[in-house]
């Protein structure tokens, strides 16, 4: 049993002496797979969060993205299209038999996505290990992200199999109900799980799920994340794929979990739910606000670059930093 676990709202980072005149001097960029991105943030590879248009926008503006895998037949054309535009391609695959064929097809046509994410709910499995090896055999130049996992053993095993990065988080997301349906996961202690996994990792980690505020991005970086995957904070933008509905004069967009019945069109093996999030305006505004908030975080950390955050002290505030005020 692990003692003393904690989550985002239980932690406060402690400021160090500021060395910049303005937060604008702080650099939030991060490197992953040989490319530099503006932010250590990636929108969740979910159907209500990302589509081709958003992927294109993110790539054009030096942000990281991972395209979802819920329209598998469009992926080949998507990779080709991104490459024709001079942009990088980043896609997701599962572990079923047809995915092996798809990887082979990419290799046969010499269509090599720069990033391939193997994305299943319980990533510590032979199925994922076999798929990592398959991709590394046929697409050796692709950067492989594998997940999702929640233990140091899983991180070590996937790295050993050839994964270039691992994705950590089992069911902590806002529309993920794995924790409720199964009793398993990192819900409620995602930040401690991230720290535990990061200590075992020799390659980058993507923290996935449980982010509710921009400050949580800085906390993720402090505890070892190279990238932070975010769903609900990216849901509900003008550009977001979901349907817009009006209720009591307010605009909302739908947001659902990747294993929800809305996603699957069926009621079996449901581990996701649907919710409506308030319409948030443009994606560019949110990305800018995230950048500015993270620049402030870096200035509080006493540095000029993102890495400064990794060295700050922290306290565990067991009464929750919101003191009963719900801000989300």
Swiss-Prot record:
One of its GO terms (molecular function) is GMP reductase activity. GO terms for biological process: purine nucleotide metabolic process. NADP(+) binds at residues 205-228. It catalyses: IMP + NH4(+) + NADP(+) = GMP + NADPH + 2 H(+). Keywords: NADP, Oxidoreductase. The active site is at residue 176. SMART domains: IMPDH. GO terms for cellular component: cytosol; GMP reductase complex. The keyword Oxidoreductase applies. Its EC number is 1.7.1.7. PROSITE patterns: IMP_DH_GMP_RED. InterPro entries: Aldolase_TIM (IPR013785), GMP_reductase (IPR050139), GuaC_type_2 (IPR005994), IMP_DH/GMP_Rdtase_CS (IPR015875), IMP_DH_GMPRt (IPR001093). It is an enzyme of class 1 (oxidoreductase). The keyword NADP applies. Belongs to the IMPDH/GMPR family. GuaC type 2 subfamily. Catalyzes the irreversible NADPH-dependent deamination of GMP to IMP. It functions in the conversion of nucleobase, nucleoside and nucleotide derivatives of G to A nucleotides, and in maintaining the intracellular balance of A and G nucleotides. This is GMP reductase. It comes from Shouchella clausii (strain KSM-K16) (Alkalihalobacillus clausii).
């Amino acid at each position: 049993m692990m003692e003393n676990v904690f989550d985002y709202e239980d932690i406060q980072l402690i400021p160090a002496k500021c060395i910049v005149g303005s937060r604008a001097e702080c650099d939030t960029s991060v490197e992953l797979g040989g490319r530099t991105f503006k932010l250590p943030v990636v929108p969740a590879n979910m159907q209500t969060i990302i589509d081709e248009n958003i992927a294109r926008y993110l790539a054009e503006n030096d942000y990281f993205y991972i395209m979802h895998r819920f329209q598998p037949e469009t992926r080949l054309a998507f990779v080709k299209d991104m490459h024709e535009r001079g942009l990088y391609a980043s896609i997701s695959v599962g572990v079923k038999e047809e995915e092996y064929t798809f990887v082979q097809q990419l290799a046969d046509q010499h269509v090599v996505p720069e990033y391939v994410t193997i994305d299943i709910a319980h990533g510590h499995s032979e199925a994922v290990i076999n798929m990592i090896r398959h991709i590394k055999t046929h697409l050796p130049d692709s950067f492989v992200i594998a997940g999702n996992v929640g233990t140091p053993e899983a991180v070590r095993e996937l790295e050993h199999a050839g994964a270039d990065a691992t994705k950590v988080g089992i069911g902590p997301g806002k529309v993920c109900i794995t924790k409720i349906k199964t009793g398993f996961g990192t819900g409620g202690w995602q930040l401690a799980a991230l720290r535990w996994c990061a200590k075992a990792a020799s390659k980058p980690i993507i923290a996935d799920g449980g982010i509710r505020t921009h400050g949580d991005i800085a906390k993720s970086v402090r505890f070892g994340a190279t990238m932070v995957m975010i769903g609900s904070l990216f849901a509900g933008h003008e550009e977001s794929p979901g349907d817009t509905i009006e209720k009591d004069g307010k605009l909302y967009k739908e947001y659902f979990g990747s294993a929800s019945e809305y996603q699957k069109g069926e009621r079996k093996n449901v581990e996701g739910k649907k919710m409506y999030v308030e319409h948030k305006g443009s994606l560019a505004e949110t990305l800018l606000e995230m950048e500015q908030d993270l620049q402030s975080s870096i200035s509080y950390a006493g540095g000029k670059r993102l890495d400064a955050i990794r060295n700050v002290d922290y306290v565990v505030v067991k009464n929750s930093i919101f003191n009963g005020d719900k801000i989300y």
